[in-house]
């Protein structure tokens, strides 16, 4: 397995990882996905568009239209 990056943990039964822009209430099917590194659960982390795990406060801001 590949080493996990900053703010990631190896998880045998991964769930739905939240991405920047998604909130805690985003629906998720309760099923295991293949083992992989995921953003540290329960710590308010989100996956950015370029694959990094960052705190919600560091998610890129959407530009107004």
UniProtKB/Swiss-Prot annotation:
A single Gene Ontology molecular function, please? serine-type endopeptidase inhibitor activity
From what superkingdom does this record's organism come? Eukaryota
- Alphabetically ordered keywords of this record: Disulfide bond, Protease inhibitor, Secreted, Serine protease inhibitor
Q: Does the keyword Transmembrane helix apply?
A: no
UniProt-reported outcome of changing residue 65 to E: In inhibitor 3
Q: What is the effect of changing residue 40 to S?
A: In inhibitor 2 and inhibitor 4
Function, as annotated, reads: Defends the organism against the host's proteinases.
Write the protein's name: Chymotrypsin/elastase isoinhibitors 2 to 5
Q: Which organism is it from?
A: Ascaris suum (Pig roundworm)
Taxonomic lineage is: Eukaryota, Metazoa, Ecdysozoa, Nematoda, Chromadorea
């Amino acid at each position: 397995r590949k080493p996990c990056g900053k703010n990631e943990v190896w998880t045998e039964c991964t769930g739905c990882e939240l991405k920047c822009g998604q909130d805690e209430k985003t629906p998720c099917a309760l099923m295991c996905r293949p083992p992989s590194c995921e953003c540290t659960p329960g710590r308010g982390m989100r996956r950015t568009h370029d694959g990094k795990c960052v705190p919600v406060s560091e998610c890129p801001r959407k530009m107004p239209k």
